[in-house]
Amino acid sequence: MIERLEKLVDDITSLNSKLVLLIGPPRSGKTALLVQLSQHRNVPVLNVGAALGQQLLMVPSTRRHLHAVGLMKDLTDETAREGLLLLDNIELLFDRTLLLNPLDFLKRHAHARRVICVWPGEVRDGRLSYGRAGHPEYQDYGINGLVPFEISDGGKRDVDAL
């Protein structure tokens, strides 16, 4: 599976939006695959929840939404290498108090560089989702402008991208 992901990372260089989402059920091997890519490309993985969370702790809660984008931009600029950014644990981006649209945020980053991100949701019927309907952080998106890379069977095989 790492070979297919490596090829995809090389192939998306010429696309307008260079966003690849690793999608699969919990414990399917998404993070392990991202770590493999990190080791092969010598690019660190940005743990968004830990890194951004630590930065936001220094900002008063009433002002965090004003600083989240700038802090995240600084973190991604520090972490990206050779036009490649690897992201994991992005759940914090869905925090409603930050007033972010996580997918649009990722797509904006993917115009300037290739972004490979573990998606903490699912894709079904051509729709990308995070959370369950009725949950306060539930999000539902179309898949235009991104490349889904589905992982199933505990990471042992991948399903063709939609």
Located regions from the model:
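N-terminal pre-Walker A segment at the start of P-loop NTPase domains
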Residues: M1-T13
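Hydrophobic anchor at the beta1->P-loop junction of P-loop NTPases
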Residues: L22
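P-loop (Walker A) phosphate-binding loop of NTP-binding proteins
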Residues: P25-P26
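Conserved glycine(s) of the Walker
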Residues: G29
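Hydrophobic positions on the alpha1 helix immediately C-terminal to the Walker A/P-loop
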Residues: L33, L37
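Short glycine-rich substrate-engagement loop in P-loop NTPases that contacts/grips substrate
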Residues: A51-T76
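Conserved P-loop NTPase "ATPase switch" module shared by AAA+ and STAND
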Residues: A80-L98
